[in-house]
Regions:
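Conserved alpha/beta-hydrolase
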Residues: 43, 48-72
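Catalytic nucleophile-loop/oxyanion-hole region of alpha/beta-hydrolase
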Residues: 38-41, 67-97, 264
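Short alpha-helix in the alpha/beta-hydrolase fold that links the catalytic acid
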Residues: 215, 229-238
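Conserved hydrolase catalytic core segment
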Residues: 101, 109-131, 137
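N-terminal cap/lid segment of alpha/beta-hydrolase-fold proteins
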Residues: 1-25
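Active-site glycine-rich loops that stabilize anionic/oxyanionic intermediates
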Residues: 36-39, 223
C-alpha cells in the first residue's frame, strides 16, 4: 500500500480536504481526481495505488459539502465554488511540480465538473482529461412532482436536501465495493434543491454551448450503468473533436471499481502513454 498524505487547502474561505499519493521519484504525470456526488476522495485508493506503481502521482480532494471538506452535506451555493476548488487544487499541484504534466480525471458529477472546468477556465495547465460516467443524462427516473418542486422551491429554500435516490447495488458488480460504500461514514445520500439546480444549469451549458476543448480527452462509460446514461457520453464525444469514446458492454456506474477495473485502469494508462509529451 502506497503512503497517503493528508492536508487542508483554502478555497473561497472554506477548508478543502486534499489527499495525495506522491511519487518517491519525479512523476511523469500527476492526476487530479474529481469524485462523484455523495462520495469522497478516499474511495480512490486502488486507483491511486495502480498509478503510483506507474510513477504517476495522484491528488484527490473532497468537494465542498462532501467528505471532510467544509460545507453542508450535498449543498452548494454556486457551481463556481466547485470550479474554484478545482482551480485551487490545480494551483497547489502546479506549485509543487512546476514542470510535471497534469491529468484531470472526473467521475459522474466529477465528470460534469471536469468538463465545465475545461470549458470555463480553458486552463493551459491540463495536458489530458479522462471523463468517467459523466453526469449528462441520468438513467434514474425522477418523478415529475419532484422536478416541479425543485424548480419552484430552490430559490426560496435552497438548502432543503432530498435523497439522491441512488440504489447502491448499481455502482458495481463487486459486492465488496457496494458494501464498503454503504458502510462508509464519509458517504452521504443528500442533494440540495440548489445543488440540483446548479448541476442542471451546468449540464444544459455542456450540451448546448459551443466550445473548443483542445486537449486529448478520453470518455469512458459502461452500457450497464443504471445511474447515468452512456448516451450523454456519446453526446459529449461528438462535441469534443479531440476525444476518444470507450464503452464497456457489461460495466456498471463506477468503471474503476467494477470487476473489469484492472483492464480499465490499464486502458487509462495506455491512453496516457500514447499522449506522452
Amino acid at each position: 500500500m502506497v503512503n497517503q498524505h493528508f492536508e487542508n487547502i483554502i478555497s473561497n474561505k472554506k477548508n478543502i480536504f486534499l489527499r495525495s499519493w506522491p511519487s518517491n521519484n519525479d512523476p511523469t504525470y500527476n492526476i487530479i481526481i474529481i469524485h462523484g456526488l455523495g462520495e469522497h476522495s478516499g474511495r480512490y485508493k486502488e486507483f491511486a495505488n495502480f498509478f503510483m506503481k506507474k510513477n504517476i502521482g495522484v491528488f484527490s480532494f473532497d468537494l465542498i459539502g462532501h467528505g471532510k471538506s467544509d460545507g453542508l452535506k450535498g449543498h452548494i451555493s454556486n457551481i463556481k465554488d466547485f470550479t474554484d476548488s478545482i482551480e485551487d487544487v490545480l494551483i497547489e499541484v502546479r506549485r509543487r511540480y512546476i514542470n510535471t504534466p497534469i491529468i484531470l480525471f472526473g467521475h459522474s458529477l466529477g465528470g460534469c465538473l471536469a468538463l465545465n472546468y475545461l470549458i470555463e477556465r480553458k486552463s493551459k495547465e491540463i495536458s489530458l482529461a479522462i471523463i468517467s460516467s459523466a453526469w449528462i443524462e441520468t438513467e434514474i427516473q425522477i418523478p415529475k412532482y419532484l422536478l416541479i418542486i425543485q424548480r419552484v422551491m430552490h430559490t426560496l429554500f435552497p438548502k432543503v436536501r432530498l435523497s439522491n435516490r441512488l440504489d447502491t447495488k448499481d455502482l458495481s458488480k463487486d459486492i465488496k465495493i457496494v458494501d464498503k460504500y454503504k458502510n462508509d461514514p464519509l458517504v452521504h445520500d443528500r442533494i440540495s434543491l440548489n445543488l440540483l439546480s446548479e448541476i442542471n444549469k451546468t449540464i444544459k451549458k455542456i450540451k448546448n454551448k459551443d466550445y473548443n476543448i483542445e486537449i486529448p480527452v478520453l470518455i469512458i462509460h459502461g452500457k450497464k450503468d443504471k445511474i447515468i446514461s452512456y448516451k450523454g457520453s456519446e453526446l459529449i464525444h461528438k462535441k469534443i473533436k479531440n476525444s476518444k469514446l470507450k464503452l464497456y458492454d457489461n460495466v456498471y456506474h463506477e468503471p474503476h471499481n467494477d470487476n473489469e477495473r484492472k483492464e480499465i485502469l490499464e486502458y487509462y494508462y495506455d491512453f496516457i502513454k500514447n499522449h506522452k509529451k
